[in-house]
Amino acid sequence: MTPTAELRTKLRKLLDEQIPAGGSDADTRFLDTDIDELLNEATNIYEAAATGWTLKAAMLQRELGQVESYSVGQERYDMRKLQDMVNYALKMAETYSRMAASSMGSVILRIQPPEVL
């Protein structure tokens, strides 16, 4: 697919990686060049989203690390479990992968007008 501003915006929505107000693409997990690469390699937007969610699962693993909770004195902090976040990202990738498979791509038809007597 050829990346356009509209496709970038739609893919960011599907990946839940929208640019914050007053921010830039550097404020998200995917730069515009990353989004363009996903779009270039995909046959449709859902295939790009599936690949993006798979990459996002790996990013979450790196970002969250292995710490699930810690305490400082009387205070205790519990974080979202890494496995839950990774499972969610992979489930989203699977959902978009199924949508990509069932989505009809572009079709080119050639119609020849009938001969009229």
Where are the regions a protein language model picked out?
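Short, surface-exposed, charged amphipathic helix/loop patches that serve as local interaction elements
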Residues: 17, 43-64
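Conserved short "hinge" loops at termini or chain/domain junctions
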Residues: 1-47, 94-117
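Flexible domain-boundary/linker segments
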Residues: 28, 65-69, 91
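Short E/K-rich amphipathic alpha-helical oligomerization segments
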Residues: 58-76
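Small-residue hotspots
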Residues: 49-50, 57, 86-96, 100
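Amphipathic alpha-helical coiled-coil segments with heptad-repeat character
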Residues: 43, 50, 72, 76-79, ...
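Extended, charge-rich alpha-helical interface modules
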Residues: 78-87, 91-94, 112-117
